[in-house]
Amino acid sequence: FSILFKLDYRYINELSCCGDDFDYYSHALTIAVDNDFDYSNQLNPSKSTFYVDGKVAPLGFYGSGLLAAPFILVGSLFDSIFVDSYIPYKIIIYSLSSLIYLFFTAYLIFKSLLLLNLKPNFTFIILSLTGSGLGFYAFERYSMTHVYEAFSVALIFYSVVKISLNKEKRIFYFLLAFSLFIALSVRYTNYHLLIA
């Protein structure tokens, strides 16, 4: 269990390696810092960067960046206050976003199963999620989409359970639409969620 708290990978100044990691981080950074999708004014391109018309153009979908952007915004605020930090707070707090979404994924699954009167075990849910490989992506490859995708599916599940059990459904229909939008923007292969 203690291996999950390995923190040395968070001690980087900027995420610029590994194509997918760089792409998802690029989306989060540009959304949080200046609210546009112009990547040229935030990032130093790496050898794996993709370009369109001479401009940085990340290939990954923007959904995980949209979910992680508030964390980068908070980290950027800390960076502007504590300017002498060796490790940027935006990286540290960004790396925690996947852990927080993993916890909320477990919580939404737990809450949904409680609403269905199934007596879930929260520890078992946490162990199932981390044992499925999500732990690796939450702790080690925190900018990848896997945890954000699990969160969006758990949010869809929770929304459907609430819609089926509540008389006042309007807010949960909105939550379902939002969670479907997030699921599709995190990874387009989630279109199968629309079919069900």
Question: Where are the model-predicted features located?
Answer:
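Transmembrane signal-anchor helices characteristic of membrane glycosylation enzymes that use polyprenol
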Residues: 1-18, 26-29, 36, 132-134, ...
